[in-house]
Amino acid sequence: MKIIIPIKRVLDPYTQARVNKQTEQVDLTNAKMAMNPFCEIAVEEALTLKESGAATETIAVSIGTDKTVDTLRTALAMGVDRAIFIKTESELDLQPLHVGKILANIIKREEAELIIMGKQAVDNDNNQTGQILSGLLDYSLGTFISQFDLSSDASSVEVSREIDSGIETRKLNLPAIVTVDLRLNEPRYASLPNIMKARSKPLETIELDSLG
């Protein structure tokens, strides 16, 4: 089973945001950036599945400018097998539908059976990309997941999430998209040896225009 983990580069949550008075937008000039915290949880869950023998390969995918490569390197250092970088001129022009269409293209190409992603990015809090992907690909969908169990034959996953009345549990047949919540796991830190190894792991760059 091949797993794709879409990840996003965001302003470090522990950094004080600055606002550009002219544009009235967050000023990211020289700002400290990091992987979206929900994406870190998605990476951890994918790695756990790989280590259990349930997954054959884990692939991190991110869309953005050249600086996005640093975030992909972080995923590789955590243990992801390879990465795909979709290069754009600007990150600000991409809306969730655009992101969904780009990711759908890559998922089809890779023939991934399971997509694990953060429930939302902490910068815009859109909470739309997973749902859009499910519609575009006609994949099963589970959102806000706090518990995840793969079946013994790897044909389905049982997922749970918190709702107002308690815990909701559903079975999703693969292929499936799962968006994860903070309660699912505790992401690992990348060790120094793994940070060094990440430099030699495959990282493919694709120009956005080439996807059509």
Task: List PLM regions with ranges.
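N-terminal glycine-rich FAD/FM-binding segment characteristic of electron-transfer flavoproteins
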Residues: M1-G212
